[in-house]
Amino acid sequence: MELQEVLHMNGGEGDTSYAKNSFYNLFLIRVKPILEQCIQELLRANLPNINKCIKVADLGCASGPNTLLTVRDIVQSIDKVGQEKKNELERPTIQIFLNDLFQNDFNSVFKSLPSFYRKLEKENGCKIGSCLIGAMPGSFYGRLFPEESMHFLHSCYCLHWLSQVPSGLVTELGISANKGCIYSSKASRPPIQKAYLDQFTKDFTTFLRIHSEELISRGRMLLTWICKEDEFENPNSIDLLEMSINDLVIEGHLEEEKLDSFNVPIYAPSTEEVKCIVEEEGSFEILYLETFKVPYDAGFSIDDDYQGRSHSPVSCDEHARAAHVASVVRSIFEPIVASHFGEAILPDLSHRIAKNAAKVLRSGKGFYDSVIISLAKKPEKADM
């Protein structure tokens, strides 16, 4: 089976779907002020045709109602600028392209569009037709749009996914060089970590080059994804998965060879690695770069606001919170796990993930490290 066929979130609206378990809205709380700033700068820059139609893409949009939260925030940001400038700026038509791989569950997004449009009209006064939303399936590591056609590109929690599993993970004798690990984790040897970094560097460089060609001069990108801070101090979601698969091997439920042949194309870069790649590629200026932490159990409660949460061990509803973490991890990785190990292990694996999540929560290290970077395409000399 091709890698792109299993690199997608769990579709549908069931208990293990990404739509039911994503806490994307909580990440957007943290990202929204920077998103607003990007949109405000775009509209104030008087870029070609932007006052008539602002063209935006959400790269790696995933599925479910949460996919449209970014669209909502963009519309609100545009309205905010319009209110500040009053009659100087008419509301432009907003053309939104939702991008993900071909296997993404776009249908669940489309089903929520009628109610979303009605809500926009009620809350923001957007007439039907002033916000146009469509799909642009395909890999964001390849060309998606015509040259110099886009104003703003957004991507949230996608760029840690690589275009392919790095080479060099198997010896000449066909033996795994990354035994006991499923990606470039803390236990991986330096050559494995370098192989993953090299693949990330290649992919991110390609991403920047291709999308710089699609953006107009001084167009913006806002990117957020998991990063590596404090030398793996805080285990992320794939670390929980790795621990739990190892538990199943130790308990005799899985063969060690099956684990050793499972390599996930994910890399969590350091902020320095991100900065160096952007500067080396050369198409963009870094406007903003910051890291932040999000608790494992963010989104456990409907009223959860992780920004107000202290970084202390969680004891309240520990089992329920750990089960929530396991559901989130499963919604992200189930397709690729089931493809390699089979669906039969999923219930046991979820149980082990919950147990490991509870341990990490008790240790006070239950946080996902994330990086957010705002980029502006450098103008051509003729535009300066």
From Swiss-Prot:
Is Nucleotide-binding given among the entry's keywords? no
GO:BP terms for this protein? alkaloid metabolic process; methylation
Instruction: Give the required cofactors.
Output: Mg(2+)
Which residues does theobromine bind?
Y157, H160, W161, S237, Y368
What are the coiled-coil residue ranges? none
Tissues expressing the protein: Highly expressed in developing endosperm and immature fruits (grains). Detected in young leaves and flower buds, but not in mature fruits.
Q: Could you tell me how this protein is used in biotechnology?
A: Tobacco plants (Nicotiana tabacum cv. Xanthi) expressing CaXMT1, CaMXMT1 and CaDXMT1 accumulate caffeine and become less appetant and toxic for caterpillars cutworms (Spodoptera litura). Caffeine also stimulates endogenous defense mechanisms against other pathogens (e.g. tobacco mosaic virus and Pseudomonas syringae) by triggering the expression of defense-related genes.
What is catalysed by this protein?
theobromine + S-adenosyl-L-methionine = caffeine + S-adenosyl-L-homocysteine + H(+); 1,7-dimethylxanthine + S-adenosyl-L-methionine = caffeine + S-adenosyl-L-homocysteine + H(+); 7-methylxanthine + S-adenosyl-L-methionine = theobromine + S-adenosyl-L-homocysteine + H(+)
Tell me how the cofactor is bound.
Binds 1 Mg(2+) ion per subunit.
> Which InterPro entries does the record associate with it?
MeTrfase_7, MeTrfase_capping, SAM-dependent_MTases_sf
* SS bonds (residue pairs): none
Q: Where is this site: Involved in substrate discrimination?
A: H154, I266, V328, E343
Say what the protein does.
Involved in the biosynthesis of caffeine. Catalyzes the conversion of 7-methylxanthine to caffeine, likely via theobromine as an intermediate.
In its UniProt entry, what is this protein called?
3,7-dimethylxanthine N-methyltransferase 1
Lineage, highest ranks first: Eukaryota, Viridiplantae, Streptophyta, Embryophyta, Tracheophyta
